[in-house]
A protein has these predicted regions:
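C-terminal active-site subregion of NodB/CE4 polysaccharide deacetylases
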Residues: 1-4, 8, 17-117
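A short, exposed helix-loop element centered on a Lys and neighboring polar residues
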Residues: 12
């Protein structure tokens, strides 16, 4: 239903470990264990990943494309441009505002009226 409505669904691991504290084999396992079940549940492939706790280093980031993801998000609102590393993208977090307020704020910052085509 979400995917049919144009939403993207990403994976975030099953048990939310701090990946930077895990050995390589466990990082690889965390990136894949449960991903298939999520893909089946949403009826679409899962190609986006969000690092648990927003914590990532170059070693962990190197595992993500090997696991078949196209991009990954970490904590922190960072600008994204044509030369941005797709596996170290910042993400906007709703925080205390909530999703509805976050969307309205983003629309204002982009000077894009809500409900516009």
């Amino acid at each position: 239903m979400l995917v049919d409505a144009g939403m993207s669904v990403g994976f975030h691991t099953l048990d939310h470990p701090v990946l930077t504290q895990l050995p390589d084999a466990e990082v690889s396992r965390a990136l894949t264990l449960g991903r298939g079940a999520l893909a089946e549940a949403v009826g679409a492939g899962i190609t986006l990943f969000a690092y648990p706790h927003g914590r990532v280093d170059s070693r962990v980031a190197s595992h993500v494309p090997k696991a078949g993801y196209r991009a990954a998000l970490r904590s922190g609102q960072r600008p994204v441009g044509p030369t941005s590393n797709l596996f170290l993208l910042g993400r906007w977090e709703p925080g205390p505002l909530g999703v509805r307020d976050l969307i309205a704020e983003a629309a204002l910052r982009l000077n894009y009226p809500i409900g516009a085509p």
